Amino acid sequence: MRIALAQIASPLDEPPEHRRERVAGMLLDAPDSDLVLLPELWAPGYFAFDDYADRGESVADGPTVTAMARVARERSQWIHVGSVLEKVGGGRLRNTAVLIGPDGGTRLTYSKMHVFGYRSKEAELLEPGTTIDATDTPFGRLATTTCYDLRFPGLWQTISDLGAEVALVPAAWPEARVAHWRLLTSARAVEHQLLVVACNAAGSQGETRIGGHSRIVDPWGEVLLELGSDEEIAACSVPDDVVAATRAEFPVLDDRLPAYDHRTDES
């Protein structure tokens, strides 16, 4: 299988409708791949907090999903939209990831469960999601998490329990903590023997420089592809059996206990 990372810049002075058109053109002109992943909230701009209320959309037929579904159909390609500001009623918004199949239909959605509060308004403006799921694809059983979710092992244990073999991670991870990004994407791949496909944003949004370094990490922790810090689309080939072969050769997950109880010494 061939997987592409679309490391997109979202400058705050670029209108979302222009960015959607620009990115759709980039994807249509990109080399062939079976699956492409975009960053977190690339269309509205993650750091465009003052505009969130005006940039919410439907995950069924909103402008971002509609534009990416058209690309998916034209290229017969799976597209992970990254995430959009989903309107969920009553003026509420969620940070929702969307996976689109080659027929343009939605195959999986996930609303980010760990909204970020440190020097960010995400936790003030967005409602956290409450559920996560996985779906079967030609690439294996697939789940998605978003950005800050990387820091929470319990969520990753859950997607492992759901049978995930591939984890897609859209992000808007700042350059200041890009070392953590690289460490955590590798760690999650190794500890759960997953193929981790992680797409960060690029460029600057206001005063914040985004870290880039989108990457694909196999279950051994080998980095199959890593981008730099600028906007680009790049792809690599990944063996179809990389997860199954790793788990068969080194069956760590077979030794995982069903529970790890905390014991208190009462003596």
Predicted features, each with a name:
Residues 49, 98, 109-116, 215, ...:
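Short beta->alpha transition motifs characteristic of CBS
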Residues 60-78, 150-234:
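CN hydrolase (nitrilase-like) catalytic-core segments centered on the catalytic cysteine
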Residues 88-162, 175-177, 183, 245-252:
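Active-site catalytic loop in hydrolytic enzyme cores
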Residues 13-103, 109, 174-194:
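Cys-nucleophile CN-hydrolase/nitrilase-fold catalytic domain and related Cys-dependent amidase chemistry
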Residues 1-5:
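Extreme N-terminal starter segment of soluble prokaryotic enzymes
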Residues 244-267:
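A short C-terminal boundary segment appended to hydrolase-like catalytic domains
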Residues 81-83, 96-99, 133, 214-216, ...:
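Short beta-strand scaffold segments in enzyme catalytic cores
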